[in-house]
Amino acid sequence: MFSFTSDQKTETPITSVYQERFTFRYGYARAGETQQADDIGQDYLAFHVENRSFQFVLCDGVSLSFYGNIAAQFLATKLLAWLRSVSVEEVRDERTMAVALHAYLGGLVEEATEIVDTYRLPRALSPLLRDVLEEKRRNGSEAMFVCGRVDIIDDWSKQANVFLACSGDMRVRLWDGTREVACFPCDEEDRHQRWSTKNGLMSGDIKTASSSGMGQPFNRMFVYSDGFAAIDSLRSIPKTERLQNLMAESFSSPTSDDISFLDIAW
């Protein structure tokens, strides 16, 4: 068994692990400006590996909402618990999973709204900034997300059942060995999609996909937030050292953003 949850105030270098038939790499870093200010990151990455099953969630808090990190952490924690609760049989039915996930997300609004409503603002805030934040509070905290589950169904062939769901501008790239075969359709046009603590899903429905419906075999996936756009153009699987260097280089960019990265192979 292996679990990971982001510490939104600490960087996690690219780390490699082999566990439960899976080989995976992961890393987390706040934007350069956020690190300098010793502030909280907006991304939240969480995953769990056990009994030949890998469940993961990556949430990217919307910075223009009320403390996007709140929605990111809350939603990631809840989605991971949901993915872990689903049976192997249920997860094979993409349509059933999509309907269940949609209902689950709607059911989180009341609890999430209470968390936002009772969140205490820092005392040192200026009256103007406090007014701005109170206005944002009324509209809720928001986050984009991608989540999924991989279940190994045959040890010999390493065949797996995969379910993916996404809302927002998140990256999911699928590989068959060292060859990239597909990119899960969550692109720039989806940047207005997100989940809100006040309104639930916004600007469109969840996009889902499954291994049975992809029409293309794959045994590896990259999942990462838009802060790691530097690897979008890479057409081969980068070594860990290069990933770490690209992550470090991004901190000095004027457009530096939080980075979450997960590479799962089976």
Descriptions of predicted regions:
Residues 93-176, 204-215:
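Catalytic core of PPM/PP2C metal-dependent serine/threonine phosphatase domains
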Residues 1-84, 170, 203-206, 210-211, ...:
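N-terminal entry segment of metal-dependent catalytic domains or homologous docking segments
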Residues 56-60, 165, 222-224:
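Short hydrophobic beta-strand that contains or immediately precedes a catalytic carboxylate
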Residues 39-49, 137-163, 185-233:
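Acidic loop->beta-strand submotif enriched in PP2C/PPM serine/threonine phosphatases
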Residues 1-44, 111-139, 157, 182-188:
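Short glycine- and acidic-rich boundary segments immediately preceding or forming the N-terminal edge
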